[in-house]
Regions:
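Charged (often Lys/Glu-rich) extended helix/loop segments that serve as interaction or gating elements
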Residues: 2-147
Length: 147
């Protein structure tokens, strides 16, 4: 790999974010669980490799911090995007950005648990373009045959 190719790959890695919406919160005795609509099928690295991705509250970052795990709605013990994070006390409907996911988005995503893949959006300043459509349930069963 040339230096320029490496630079391009590095930029892609740093440029991508996974934008997710808070569904609800569970309050535990030692920490909270923030359940979001993204899951391990959207970003497998934290569950598979215990990788660290910074998580930023997109809305209302001025709230007090809570210690929380950020987890998906898939019924798996490994369905987490971040563990033991100090994060503003976000509420349902608010958004979180999981950072540095550009090189790991669609290429490592799956349809696990019959979940359609998320769309990909290219943002250039104030402009944006959908570069990969959100999958539908029809996409999931395309190619299947009745027997």
């Amino acid at each position: 790999m040339t230096k320029e190719e490496f630079r391009q790959v590095s930029l892609g890695f740093q440029a991508g974010i996974l934008l997710t919406t808070v569904l609800y919160r569970k309050h535990g005795p030692e920490k909270e669980f923030i359940i979001v609509d993204a899951a391990m099928n959207d970003l497998i690295r934290p569950a598979l490799y215990k990788s660290h991705h910074e998580v930023i509250a997109v809305t209302r970052a001025d709230r007090p911090l809570v210690l929380a795990d950020i987890v998906g709605p898939v019924c798996e013990s490994g369905d987490f995007l971040a563990r033991d994070r100090q994060i503003p006390a976000v509420e349902p409907g608010e958004r979180l950005a999981v950072c540095t996911t550009g090189a790991y988005g669609f290429v490592l995503s799956s349809n696990y648990n019959a979940r359609p893949r998320a769309p990909e959006v290219l943002v250039d300043g104030p402009d944006f373009t959908i570069i990969r459509d959100r999958e539908s349930y029809a996409d999931l069963i395309r190619g299947e045959r009745a027997v």
